[in-house]
């Protein structure tokens, strides 16, 4: 799977989150990090979209929406003829959203300070995915990055890597398979650390076996209840 990350940040040089995200995927050859400029070559942008399977729009939240830079890019590149019309050039591709905010995540809910959830605010992108026959992915929202402690940043790094490269969904089984594949790569690349990494890999596989057994037991119990 090839992933294209469209970075729409009007002040990219001053961003704290974008260098973090860029570093997180720099060793993944199947991921393209593509910061937008103010002028677009439509044919080149459309070609990039066609070459990738998962398209991720990445931006800071500006007044409950994306920055004007992304809107300009979409209006220019996503022509009706290309994205919808008779071509549906993006049909079957995945569309993901990575949005960063300066507010606490708990503020984005009914009855709280911002009143609306991030998913509600991002509905225009879901509508776009529906119109162009793309698969809309769950949103990855990052709140108050500057206040994240080291362990939270590490969890975010892994979550971001999975969001951009994991072929499966967000279920434990898919996450475990992703971890196994990535650990195996590191074992091959760093033989000196293989013993420790092998132990971690063994633990993940063991937990997956336990989960499979639990799921099987639950299925059997459900069958007995239905009799």
At which residue positions do the language-model features occur?
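N-terminal beta1-alpha1-beta2 submodule of the flavodoxin-like/Rossmannoid cofactor-binding fold
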Residues: 1-83, 171-227
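Short catalytic/ligand-binding loop motif for oxyanion handling, primarily in non-cytosolic enzymes
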Residues: 13-14, 64-66, 105-107, 146-148
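Short, electropositive alpha-helical surface patch
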Residues: 58, 115-119, 150-165
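Charged helix-capping and loop-helix junction motifs
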Residues: 72-80, 118-122, 154-157
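Short secondary-structure boundary/capping segments
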Residues: 86-88
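Short, glycine-/small-residue-rich phosphate/pyrophosphate-handling segment
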Residues: 91-137
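A short secondary-structure junction signal
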Residues: 106-111, 141, 148-152
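A conserved mid-domain beta-alpha-beta active-site/ligand-binding segment of alpha/beta enzyme cores
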Residues: 130-145, 157-191
């Amino acid at each position: 799977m090839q992933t294209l990350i469209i970075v729409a940040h009007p002040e990219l040089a001053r961003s704290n989150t974008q260098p973090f995200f860029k570093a997180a995927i720099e060793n993944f050859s199947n991921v393209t990090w593509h910061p937008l400029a103010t002028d677009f070559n439509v044919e080149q942008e459309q070609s990039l979209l066609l070459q990738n399977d998962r398209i991720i729009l990445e931006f800071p939240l500006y007044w409950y929406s994306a920055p004007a830079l992304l809107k300009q890019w979409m209006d220019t590149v996503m022509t009706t003829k290309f994205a919808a019309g008779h071509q549906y050039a993006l049909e079957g591709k995945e569309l993901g959203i990575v949005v960063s905010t300066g507010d606490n995540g708990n503020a984005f809910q009914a009855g709280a300070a911002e009143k609306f959830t991030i998913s509600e605010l991002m509905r225009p992108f879901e509508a776009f995915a529906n119109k162009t026959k793309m698969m809309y992915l769950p949103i990855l929202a990052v709140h108050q990055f500057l206040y994240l402690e080291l362990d939270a940043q590490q969890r975010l790094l892994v979550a971001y890597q999975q969001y951009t490269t994991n072929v499966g969904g967000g279920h434990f089984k898919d996450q475990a398979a992703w971890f196994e594949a990535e650990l195996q790569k590191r074992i091959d690349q760093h033989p000196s650390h293989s013993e420790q990494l092998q132990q971690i890999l063994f633990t993940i596989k063991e937990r997956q076996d336990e989960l499979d057994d639990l799921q099987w037991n639950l299925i059997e119990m459900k069958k007995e209840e239905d009799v």
